[in-house]
Curated annotation (Swiss-Prot):
Pfam families: Ras. This is Ras-related protein Rab-21. The keyword Repeat does not apply. A motif (Effector region) lies at residues 45-53. It is found in: Golgi apparatus membrane.
Amino acid sequence: MASPSDASRRRQATVKAKVVLLGEGAVGKTSLVLRYSENKFNDKHEQTLQASFVEKRLNIGGKRIQLAIWDTAGQERYHALGPIYYRDSQGAIIVYDITDEDSFHKARNWIKELKRMLGDKVTLCIVGNKIDLDRQRTVSEKDALEYAESVGAKHYYTSAKQSKGVAELFLDLAKRILEANPPSSSTPPESQRGAPSSHPPSQPRQRSTLIVTDDSEQPSPKQGGGCCS
């Protein structure tokens, strides 16, 4: 029979999950991470070089999860580095720009590569970003939803500029990862894969490392700002 202290340790066990953002350059991956982690928006486009990451801790229904969120470079010259960063990921967010049909088609290539590397073990999100530019949309909602369903992914719409759907995206992903990787007595606390300390051989350029402890499962209030998505 488990002692009260054993039960307490199980309750406090933290699932660590590695989440990787993939997509072409300028679709808004870095803006999504910045909005989620710091509730900020930078109207100046800055290219991500190789990769950077932030951390986020959540408490969802008494279950603790720590997300190591990896923001990867979308420029073609960095594509070969992709597998280094998304191996051992529990979650993947593939981002496209709803005003750029080519970014949607290329998102399919990222998903094919993910499936080849990770199979169906990864919790998959497809994100149409820049929903604030809906009048300039070139990717139909029907095509996006049908494709997401065909690959076993959930589809989301976001606007980093207006803070629409961003907190909800990461919260839902965290819930899905917890469902797929529930904490158990056989899993030591703070020991799941995806910890930021497990850096790939090539060290990432860190934009910042932010730890926010024990966020509730309620999304943060929406805030706008900036001039780009």
